[in-house]
Amino acid sequence: MSDSWVPNSASGQDPGGRRRAWAELLAGRVKREKYNPERAQKLKESAVRLLRSHQDLNALLLEVEGPLCKKLSLSKVIDCDSSEAYANHSSSFIGSALQDQASRLGVPVGILSAGMVASSVGQICTAPAETSHPVLLTVEQRKKLSSLLEFAQYLLAHSMFSRLSFCQELWKIQSSLLLEAVWHLHVQGIVSLQELLESHPDMHAVGSWLFRNLCCLCEQMEASCQHADVARAMLSDFVQMFVLRGFQKNSDLRRTVEPEKMPQVTVDVLQRMLIFALDALAAGVQEESSTHKIVRCWFGVFSGHTLGSVISTDPLKRFFSHTLTQILTHSPVLKASDAVQMQREWSFARTHPLLTSLYRRLFVMLSAEELVGHLQEVLETQEVHWQRVLSFVSALVVCFPEAQQLLEDWVARLMAQAFESCQLDSMVTAFLVVRQAALEGPSAFLSYADWFKASFGSTRGYHGCSKKALVFLFTFLSELVPFESPRYLQVHILHPPLVPGKYRSLLTDYISLAKTRLADLKVSIENMGLYEDLSSAGDITEPHSQALQDVEKAIMVFEHTGNIPVTVMEASIFRRPYYVSHFLPALLTPRVLPKVPDSRVAFIESLKRADKIPPSLYSTYCQACSAAEEKPEDAALGVRAEPNSAEEPLGQLTAALGELRASMTDPSQRDVISAQVAVISERLRAVLGHNEDDSSVEISKIQLSINTPRLEPREHMAVDLLLTSFCQNLMAASSVAPPERQGPWAALFVRTMCGRVLPAVLTRLCQLLRHQGPSLSAPHVLGLAALAVHLGESRSALPEVDVGPPAPGAGLPVPALFDSLLTCRTRDSLFFCLKFCTAAISYSLCKFSSQSRDTLCSCLSPGLIKKFQFLMFRLFSEARQPLSEEDVASLSWRPLHLPSADWQRAALSLWTHRTFREVLKEEDVHLTYQDWLHLELEIQPEADALSDTERQDFHQWAIHEHFLPESSASGGCDGDLQAACTILVNALMDFHQSSRSYDHSENSDLVFGGRTGNEDIISRLQEMVADLELQQDLIVPLGHTPSQEHFLFEIFRRRLQALTSGWSVAASLQRQRELLMYKRILLRLPSSVLCGSSFQAEQPITARCEQFFHLVNSEMRNFCSHGGALTQDITAHFFRGLLNACLRSRDPSLMVDFILAKCQTKCPLILTSALVWWPSLEPVLLCRWRRHCQSPLPRELQKLQEGRQFASDFLSPEAASPAPNPDWLSAAALHFAIQQVREENIRKQLKKLDCEREELLVFLFFFSLMGLLSSHLTSNSTTDLPKAFHVCAAILECLEKRKISWLALFQLTESDLRLGRLLLRVAPDQHTRLLPFAFYSLLSYFHEDAAIREEAFLHVAVDMYLKLVQLFVAGDTSTVSPPAGRSLELKGQGNPVELITKARLFLLQLIPRCPKKSFSHVAELLADRGDCDPEVSAALQSRQQAAPDADLSQEPHLF
C-alpha cells in the first residue's frame, strides 16, 4: 500500500509525531476488543479481498516489516539489470517473508504468492515498450519475465504457489496479457496452457481471445521480425497442443478440471482459424495484405516441421480429416447448377495458390485411398461447397497418379447406383467429378469425351439395361442443357449415347434441344473445331482461329505418324461444312512453296491423293502459290510477322520453371513441387497454343526423322526451355541430395512433357544427341541422361517411335530410341556415347538402388548398356582385364554432377561397381560377340579414337582372347572358330543389308558394302577362314574330299530362305542386294571355298562345287548375271579355284575336263560366263597352267578357245570355219560376239547362218531372244534395241526359210533334257517369264504358211497370248516398256498395250484358218485362263466344235 492510503489526522500517529505501523495498530485493536471467532473469520476474508484488490507487495512489505523491508522490493528481484538484484535478498528470503505475511493475515501462502506473481506478470506485459507487436514481448520484458518465472518456480518447488488461483488472477488482467507470456508460463511449467484455458469461466470468450492472438501471431511471423524464431516456436507449440488435446480419443485431463472443456476450446480455435482463412480466400484476399499473411502463415502450420513432434499419427490424421471436412462443407452457398456452369474456372492451375498449398499439405498425411473415401463420405452425408470440392478433385488427380483409377472406380459405382435407383445426386456428382478431373489434361485423367463415349457409346453402357434407364439419362442431360458449356453440348451431339432404334426419339429430342441451346448461344455445331479443348477459359473460339489451330495440330500429327489423322478423315465425311468452309481454306493459304517439301506440302498432297481436296480448290491454291513465287517482293510484303503472342506465355513458362528450380535446393519446399509442375503444364499448353483435347489425338506411333529432325520455332523454344530447366533442376537437386533422395520431381516433370510435347521432346533429343552430342556440356549430358532414365521408367505409357532409316522399320520403345540416337563411329561420338551411358547407368543405379535389378534394367534399353560395355573394352585396356573381388568399387553420383566431371574415372568406377557387375549377369544386357561385331562395323577408321595398330590389337583381343573362348551362354563361341566365322559373316550381312552402312556414302558400289570401315573386320575373317581351311586339310585323310556343306553356303542358304520370295520390286531388290554381298564376301576369301582344296577321282565333284553350282543356278542366275553371264570377278575366282584344286590332284588335265564337262549339265552358266570373259580369263589360266604342267590346256578349256575363235571367224569377212561342238556353246559364243559388233556390220555376216547346223541356229535364236529381252529390261544396255530386233528377225527368217521348228523354245520345261534343262539354267527366270512378250514382238516376222502349216503353232500362239495378258494384268510388262523416244523408232512393237492388241487381232484372224487338228489341246489352255479374253476363248471353242470348212481360201490373209 502507498503512503497516501494513511491519513495524517488519524490516530495512527503517536503524540511524539512518530507514525505507527499497521501491525501496531492491529495489535492495539486486538487488545482493546474482545476476541470474536466469527469476527476473526470475516477479518481474514476482508484481508484476502484487500490483498487481491491491492497487490503491491512492495508497499505491503513496507507496511508489515517497517524500514527493514524497504530492501525487499520485488521489482528489484525481477529487474535483471539492477545491480541490487539478488545481491542481498534470495528467493528463500522472499518466500519466508511471504510465509510470515500469510500467517499474520491468515491467508494461504499459495494464494498470496499467486496474486503477487500474477500482478507482476501484468505489470511486465503493460510496461511501456516498443509495443508494435501485440503478442510478443520486448527483449527487456522477456528478461524481466524470465527472472519472475525463476522466482515462481522456486515457489512451486516449495509448495508456496497456487496454480488455480494464479490462473484466475491472470484472466482478470486478460486485456493486458500477452500471448508470449502465456507461452512462457506453459513452457517453463509454471502453469500449462491446458490449465489456463480450462480455468476461464467463459469458453467462447477464451476461444475468441486465442483466435485474435493467433491471428496477430501469424501476421507477426510473416512480417519477418527479429523475434521470428520465438513466434514460430510459439505457434508450433500451440498447434501441437491443440491437435493433441482436441483430436485425442482418450484425453489425459486432470481430475480437477472438466474433461470436455479443453477439446471444445482447441477445436473451436482451430475451426475459427480455418474458417477465417476460407472466408478470406472466398472474398478475394489481396496479395501481401495482412489477411493474406495470416492465411499463408496459418496454412503453413499443416506442414511437417510445425507438426513434426506429434508422436502419434492418429490425432494428426483425425485433425487433417476434420480440416478436410470443414474445407469441403464450410459455407455451401453454391448449387450443383452453379458448379456445372463455373467448374472450368476451378482447375488446379486457377485455384488460389494458398488453397492448393493447403491441399498438398493434407495429402502428405492422408493417402489417395483415404482422401477419395473421405470425399465420398462427405458428399454422401453433408451439404458441400462445390468450388472447394471440385478444386480438391483437381488437386487430387494432379498430385496422386493413382487417383485416376480410384476416381474412375468411384465414378463407376456412382453411375451404377444412379441408374439402379434413378439417384439424381449420384449422377450429378459423377458428372462433375469426371469433368473436373478431365480439366487437368490427359496425363492426369481421361478426357470427358472419351469417358462419355466409354460410358454411353456402346451396348454395355450404364443406360442400356432398360427404358427407365434411358429416360433417366436423357432427362438428366436435358436438365443440364440450360447450364451446360457449349463444349459439353458439342460432345454429347458428336458422340451421342447408343440408343436402340425403338427409343430413337429420346435421342433426337435431346439433340434438338441441345442444338437449340447452341443456337441461342450463337455457337454452330458445324463450326466446331477438330481438336477442341473442354478446359479452355473461353466458351468458344472463332471458327477461323480454331481452324488455324486445327491445321497446325493436324500437320503435327501427320508429321509424327506419317498418316492423315483420323480426326481429319472423319471431319471430311461427317463434318464437311466445317471441313470445307474453314479447315481447307486455313490449310490452303497461298504461300511461296519451299524448295524442299515440308510437312505442310506433304500433308496437302496426301489429302489430294485421298480425294479430300476438291480439284477446283486445289487448282486455285496452286495458282496462288505460283503467283506468290512470281512476285516474291509482294509476297514478302504481304506476309506480316505474326504478333508474338507467345512471348507472354513464354515468359510465364520461364517464371514457372524458375520457381521449380528454386524449390530444388529447399527441402521445406518439396511438397509444392507437384503443384509447380501442374502450373508448368498449364503454362506449356499456353505457349504451344494447344487448345485441343490432347487425349483425343490419335498418336499410336510417333514418326521421327532421325537424319533430318525438324521442329517449329515455337516448339523449339518451349522444348529447349523444358530441357534446360530439367538439366538445371537435376544439378541443383544433386547439390543437396543424391538421386534416391530427391523425391518424385523428375518423374512428375517428365510426365508433364510426355503428356504435352513428347514428339517435340524426342525430336529435340534427336537433334541434340545424334547431331550435336559431342558439343554438349557435362550438365547437359547428365540432365539428358537422367531424362532418358525417367522416360524409360514411363515406357509402358508411351507410344512407340518409328525413326525410319537407318533404324529398323518396326516401332521402337522410347528407351531403345536412345540406343539409336547414340552413334559409335568417330572419336568424338565414341567419347560422347561413353559419357551419356556412364551418366544414365550411374543415375539409374543410384535412383533405384533399393529396387530390383529388373527395375534397373527396365529404365534403360539393353542396347545402351551393351554400348557402354563395348566402349569400355575399346577405350580402356584396364577393362579388358578380369576383375577381382578387391577391384569392386562403390558408386557415387556426386562426382558426376560437378562441373569438372572426370568421365574416365567415373566410367571405371561404374565398371567395377558391384551392382553393375550383377546387372551384367542378366542375359539380355550382356555384350555378346554378335553385338560387338555390329558396333565395331560402324566405326570409321579414319576418325577412330584408336590408331590402326591399336585397332588391330583390340580386334585380336576381342575375337581370340575374349569372345572365342567364352561360352555360348555368355555370348561367346565356345572356342569354335567356325562358329566365330559364322557369326561374323552374318553380322557383315546384317550390317550391309541395313541402311546404316550407307549413311556416309553416295555410291555403295565404290567400296565394300558402301563403307571403308569394314576392311579390318574383313581381314580378321580372311585370317579365320584361312585357319579353318588349314584345319580342314589336316582333318580330311589323303585321297578324300570333305563331304559336308561349307559353313558359308549354309549361311547363304538359311538367309535366302528367310527372305521374302516373289517377283515384286522390293523382294527382288532385297534378294539382289543380299546376293551381291554374298559375292563380295566370297571374292575376299580363298578360292578353295568355291571348289574345295583338291579333287579326287573317287569324288571328282566336291560338295563345295555342288553348293556353288546350286547357288549359281538358283540365285545368281537371276540376280547376279547379265546377258547370260556372271560377272567377271566371280567367274575368274571360280576358275582360279578350279585350277588350284585340280593341280593338286594326280591327273590335273583329266580333272579339269571332268569338272567342266559336268558344268554343261549342272551349271552351264559358268561356261557361258567364261566365254564372255575369255579374253581376260585366258592369259591368267594359261600362265597358271603352264607354271605347273607342260601339257597343253585341258580339252574342255580348249573348247572355250575354239568357241571364241569360231565366233570371231564367223563375223570376219573371210570364210567361216565349221562350228565346234557342242552347238549350244558355239551358239552362245556367236551370240556374245554379235553383241560386240555394230549393227551395220552384222546383216551381211548373218547370211552365213544358212550354212550352219540346225541345232546351232535354234540355240542362237534363243540367246538372241534373251538379248532382246535384256535390251528391254536394261535401260543402259550396250546392245541397241533395234539391233536386237534385227538380229532376232534375221535368225527367225533363216529358221523359217530352212523350215526349222523353233516353237519348242517357247515351251521349255526342266523335263526337256535336250533344250529345257540346259537353256533354263542359262536364262534368268524373269527372261523366260517374258518370252510371250518376245514372241509377239516378232509378230511381223512370222511366215504366213508356217503359222498354218505347224500344227503346234496355234497352241503356242494362244498360250503366249494368254500368258502375255496375265503378265500385263500383273504389271510385269511395265519392266519392258520402251523408254521415251524409242516407241516411235520401234513402231509400237515395245508398247505392251499395242502388242496385246495386235496379238489379239492376229489370233482372231488365225483361228478360222487353222486346221481342226490344231485345236486338239485348246481345252487344256482355256481350262484355267479362259476368262483372260472371252472373245478369243469363244472363237477357239466355236472353231473347235465346227466341222472342217473346205472353203478356207476365202478368208483374208493374215500377213
From Swiss-Prot:
Its main location: nucleus. Phosphorylation is required for the formation of the nuclear complex. Not phosphorylated in cells derived from groups A, B, C, E, F, G, and H. Changing N8K: In FANCA; benign. GO terms for cellular component: chromatin; cytoplasm; cytosol; Fanconi anaemia nuclear complex; nucleoplasm; nucleus. A motif (Nuclear localization signal) lies at residues 18-34. It is found in: Nucleus; Cytoplasm. It holds the Pfam family FANCA_helical. Changing S1088F: In FANCA; benign. GO terms for biological process: DNA repair; female gonad development; interstrand cross-link repair; male gonad development; male meiotic nuclear division; protein-containing complex assembly; regulation of CD40 signaling pathway; regulation of germ cell proliferation. Keywords: Cytoplasm, Disease variant, DNA damage, DNA repair, Fanconi anemia, Nucleus, Phosphoprotein. The keyword Nucleus applies. The modification Phosphoserine is found at S1449. InterPro entries: FANCA, FANCA_arcN, FANCA_helical, Fanconi_A_C, Fanconi_A_N. Belongs to the multisubunit FA complex composed of FANCA, FANCB, FANCC, FANCE, FANCF, FANCG, FANCL/PHF9 and FANCM. The complex is not found in FA patients. In complex with FANCF, FANCG and FANCL, but not with FANCC, nor FANCE, interacts with HES1; this interaction may be essential for the stability and nuclear localization of FA core complex proteins. The complex with FANCC and FANCG may also include EIF2AK2 and HSP70. Interacts with FAAP20/C1orf86; interaction is direct. DNA repair protein that may operate in a postreplication repair or a cell cycle checkpoint function. May be involved in interstrand DNA cross-link repair and in the maintenance of normal chromosome stability. It is linked to Fanconi anemia, complementation group A: A disorder affecting all bone marrow elements and resulting in anemia, leukopenia and thrombopenia. It is associated with cardiac, renal and limb malformations, dermal pigmentary changes, and a predisposition to the development of malignancies. At the cellular level it is associated with hypersensitivity to DNA-damaging agents, chromosomal instability (increased chromosome breakage) and defective DNA repair. This is Fanconi anemia group A protein. The gene is FANCA.
